[in-house]
Structures are given as structure tokens and as C-alpha cells.
């Protein structure tokens, strides 16, 4: 009766099947490498959203009391909301609430759908002047590419037409998800009213607004219906051009004399002064943000987009250029190329190292298992829909050294048995069979080591690591099977002789590094067994020294992103006009662009860029904020520029804080954040001043500030009730009049030119260049516009200071004292110093101290 063969013996007998299967799997792995899913990071569930509520005319305090608090109470009624990380920022007329969801919530789309429906219903309970409440649940979506379309001479409208044509072409690429365009400035028809002429004819702004609104409003004209046919009725629009607006009759006297709009106002078609704009290398531009569909190959998508852009560029005028600011597909492609380079280096290193100890044939057999295992693993990744990203690439790199160990152990045993006189066939089978249990146990032990990560981590870190244990297990499992089933035949076929000690002409053994190593290793073993207590003591001492050294090493959970780009954030006092912000941004941009190491500078003035890197969240901007995305010639150039420019230009501009930010994978906004919470804002301010002074005295810190921002200079108009009532002036009439004359304009109609809408706005010529004296002397119409009185006659006009921003975290007022680090400082080390220093301060008993820096945003 034939003896039953084990797996190794079966593989030797049916080697043709094993070789065929291995070749097919390797070929599939080679095919999978360019075609499998690739991305920079694993798919994160960004459990964040933004709720924005707008209520013009409210101060920051009024926004807190009337809007933020009711919204917070409603938001906290959802059990899915993580309250301690949900916070609101109330500003002049607007409130932003960043909602953080619980880490265990995976189906965020279901929650946001339910939440949006609830918020739309809840809006009715807010004050009537709350114009809109919007929920943005795409806050965490990351742009795969940011592409600018720039020109010096073309108008925004022309650029928009070219951008539409580009989007039409890009939509043909199946892997592209959402595309959004930023930076568009639309034309408007501005009606600059002459208040003196209005008074002369007894007209008011409100009268004109109502007249123009009725001319521009479109509704159904009904239908002509009979038993045979139904004809819709369309009333032609009266406002179709600038001339139509100019020629509108706004007043007719009893004898038929007409007053047209052009008689009392200057009507022009123009680009209004923007509150925000985007430029690239000093040229006006539109920014196209491209996102990838989930589960697609970002490298292939990038190649298709670049091909499409190359084909589209010749169709554009010569002064219109396309430029790619950020390209995640290039980052991922470079990561794959770097891995292949590391793979080649590993194979060569194994061959060289093994050659020092063993013959060439042995080295080649051992080294050949590396590419075989890697490509089979890549094929399995593709088959199991595991994408190639930073985490899975890390798993492949970590296991490079482990892959070859299994093969070397079996080959070494094979050589030993050959030296004992065992036949090649039986030596090959016995070597693999003898060590299979040991190798299998080691593989299981190493694989199981990483699975507790899936239990101990939550939220974003778990999303980041979820594929790591599986990738490790697949690679090591493939390595085990290759060593047990393929290596036995490879060593049988290629290694035909045992290792023999070489001799010289005198018959003496030649020097062998392996023999020398074995000789001294045996001596060391003898010493260890002779002095067992000393051996144990040295082992214990080495563990203690290792623990001490580990505690002294600088720690950082999430690393710096090695990129050829960095960000710059410019912040000015609250209320700063976008023109002044633009001047400082333009000056710094010129400084950067004059450096040959800088390739491009994309400038966002009054706004923030889309999320172009997973951990770099978009900023909540205003007219006092600007941001750069700076591209450099290399990763090293980025380091050099930051080391040179950050210390020099952080405080270079008066009133401006300039933050040079190197991209990293940590989600903390600032590396050092000290939070003071309580119910009294004045108390919090006093305590925050202590912390601010302390942090500014520490040389490791720069850009120390608070999130309450600087006070906002305002003008408060208080009606003299008796005089105003006698003259028929109400709050609504006064607010409407001042809004028309000192605001960005009141929209009264829309003119359509095809698919291009042009807003018609009533405004005052001094709206963008006025001061407090002009406001006091402003003539307010009374008696239906037949007379005017200066504002100071019916109201007190007084300057006032208001809070620039009020922040509440978990429904409690919270001032955060923030600070950035000097270049080269370690965030966790500095945080420890800050904690020790702050511990020596005395705070009011009703103030709670917490931290929100790198140490506390990094999961343990």
C-alpha cells in the first residue's frame, strides 16, 4: 500500500502544476500592479460636517444667543453627534457650527440625510431674520487634482466658457466624481443712485426697488385652452440688456412727463469689487477641483486627465493656460515607483548578503522568492479589492525582510542534509517538512500581532489601519506557501552540491566568513552558559536602557508629508478689508515667486482652498484671511524654504500673522492649544491673557493668538424714538436705506444672456469708500421722499466694539489659546513643557482647563 504523500512531497511530484500556478499568479500580479485600485490613503470616513446660519444685522453676541444656542441644542439632540468635539464660531451676521460624529458611526450618509431634513424643519423655530441654514456634509471630501485656468487679458466670463468646455471633456472619464469651480466673478448691472436727484423728484430707493422688482419678476402667464389644444402664454421679459434697465420709466407726472432710471442713476455693467478672489502666479484664474469616485484607480485617472488636458490646451487662446496646482495621482504614482525601487534594492541586497555567506546559486534561489511573493500578493490584493495605498505599501515594505527568511531557513536545512549524504530529492522534501510547523507558527504569530489594532483603535485611525493586518497576513501567507511548495523544487533543481570547505594549494582551509562567524558565535554561547546570571542581567539591562532611550526620543504619531509643496496662511485683524489683505498677500507672493526654488504660488484671498490633502482641513475664511499653496522644485526644497522663510516672515508684516505650514498627516489645526471653558466671557478673556503672556514668553512657540479674534470696530445707530416717529422713520425703512447705500447692493432683478445670469443691483456710489462722518450726514428720506433729514437728526451714531468671534465648544464658551512651533521643535515635547508651565498658573474656579493639541488629537 502506497504511503500517503504530504503537501511538500506532493508539490515535488507535481511540480509542473505548482510552477504553472505560480507563473499564472505572478503574471496576474504583474497585470494587477498598473490596473489595481490606487490612492494616497485608505478611504476615510470623515465624520465632520458644517452647519452655517446667516442672519444679517446681528452682532456676534446676538448670533450666539438667538441662533447658535438653539442650533446647538437641536444638534445635541442627535445621539450620533460627538458633543465634546462639536463647536460653534459666531461672527458678525453668521455662525459656523462644526459637527463631529461618533467614531463608531460608519454610515454617515444616512445620518446627514436625516439631519438635513431635520434642520430644514427646525429653521422655522429660528428668528425671522435668519435667511438660510445650510448643512455641508462634503466637508471631508479631498480633491484629487486642483487645476487652474489662468489669463491676464480674458474676462472671467470668457474663462468660464472655456472651463465649461474643459469640464464637458473631463466628464467622459468614468473615474471622475464631482467637479467644482471656484474663483468665478460674475458681472452685474450696478445702478448707482443719485440721492439728490431722487429727492428732487420725490423718489425713494424703496420705490425704485419695487418698480424694478416687478419688471424683473417672472411667473406663469397662464394658458389658452380649448377642446382641441392648450397654448402656454409667456410674457416677454422687459429687462434684457443694460439699455433696457437704463430706459425704465420710474416716475410719470400727471401731464405725462416721464422720469427714466438713467435720469436719477448711473447704470453700468461691471465686475463688482470682490470679497474674495483666486490667482495663480499673479494671474486671475478659475480653479477646478476634481474628486475621484470611490474605488477607482487614481493613477489611471490622473493619466487620463493629463491626456485630456494636453489635447484640450491647443484649442484655447494663446494667453489662456492650464496649470495643475496639486496632483494626488502623481503622489501615488511616485509612491508606487519608490516601492518598486525599494523592491529592486531589497533583491540586490539579499543577493549580496547571502553571497557573503553562501554560494551564488543559493543567493539567487533565496532572492527570487521576493518578486514571486510580492507579485502574487499584489494579484491577491487586486482580487480581494484591497487598494494600493500608503498603508498597504508600508505592509509590503515591512515584510520584504520577512519574505526571504522562510526560504533561507529551508535552503540552509537542505544544504545541511546534502552534507550528511542525503539525496537531493529527499533532502529537499525533509528540509521543507521539518521546518514547516515552525515557519507556520512564526507566520501566524507575526500576522496576529497586528489584528488587535482593529479592536483598540477607533474612528479615523481605524479607517487608516484596517487593511494593514490583512495585507501583512496575505504577504506572509504567500511567502509561507512559496517556501513550502515552490522552494523545495527550486533548490532541488538549482543547488546540486553541498557546501564544501574550500582549500588552498597547501591543503589548508581557505578563510570563510561563515566559519569565522560560527566559531565566534560558539565561543559567545559558551560564555553565556558559563555566566548565566551575568547574561540575564545584561539582557535585563538592555531592556531598561531601551525603555529609557525610547522615552527620550522625540515622538510623533502621524508623520510629516514629504511633498514638493506647502501652505501659507495669512491672518489680519477682524474687519480688515479684502483690499488690504490682498496687498499683504501680493507682497509675500512676490517674495516667494522671486525664489528660483518656487515653481508656482496659488493665492486665495478672502477665501480658502478646497481640501487638497486629507489631513489639511479647509479654513473658515473671511476678508481678513489669505492662503497660498506653494509648489517647489523638490521635497528637499520645501524643507529648505520653510527653514529659511518661516523665521523671517512670520512677523514681517505689521498687523499680519503669517503661518508657514508644512503638510502633515495630523488633523490638529495647531500643535499647541490651551482651552479655557466657562460661562462668563469676560472671565475667560482675563484668564486667556495669562496663558497668552506665558506662551509668548516661551522661545519654542510663535504665532500665539486666541480663537476669539480681535475686537470688531462697528458703528451703532440708535434711533431717537420721538423725532424718528414724528418724521415717519421706522427701523425697517432706515435699515433698508442704509443697506442700499452702504452695502454691496440690493438685488432687484436678473438679466439672462443665454445661460449666463447677470444680477441687477441698487447701490450707492460711496458704498465702498465711506467713513463714519459720511454716515452721520447721510440724508434720510421722509414724507415719501419729498424731503430729507440728516441721520444725526433722527439717530445717535456712536462707535462701538463688538466681539470679532465667539466660540462655544460642547455648548460652553471656550477660548482657545493657540500657538505654532518654531522650526525643528517637537510638538509633544513642547506640549509637555506648556502643561508644566500652565500648571503653575492660578485660574478662576469656574474656568475649566483642557488641551486640544497634537497630544490630544492623536489617538493612543
Language model feature labels by segment:
Residues 16-17, 23-58, 62, 106, ...:
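Transmembrane helices with small-residue packing motifs
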Residues 29-32, 348, 352-356, 360-415, ...:
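Hydrophobic transmembrane alpha-helices and their membrane-interface caps
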Residues 400-414, 436-456, 463-506, 628:
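Transmembrane alpha-helices and their membrane-interface boundaries in multi-pass membrane transporters
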Residues 325, 336, 411, 417-441:
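Helix-loop junctions and hydrophobic alpha-helical segments within the transmembrane domains
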Residues 5-8, 12, 62-138, 196-217, ...:
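Solvent-exposed, membrane-proximal periplasmic/extracellular interface segments of envelope transport
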Residues 1-38, 435, 447, 489, ...:
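Signature of alpha-helical transmembrane segments and their immediate interfacial
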Residues 856-860:
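Conserved small/polar residues in nucleotide/adenosyl-binding loops
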Residues 2-13, 21-38, 113-149, 186-275, ...:
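Helix/segment boundary signal
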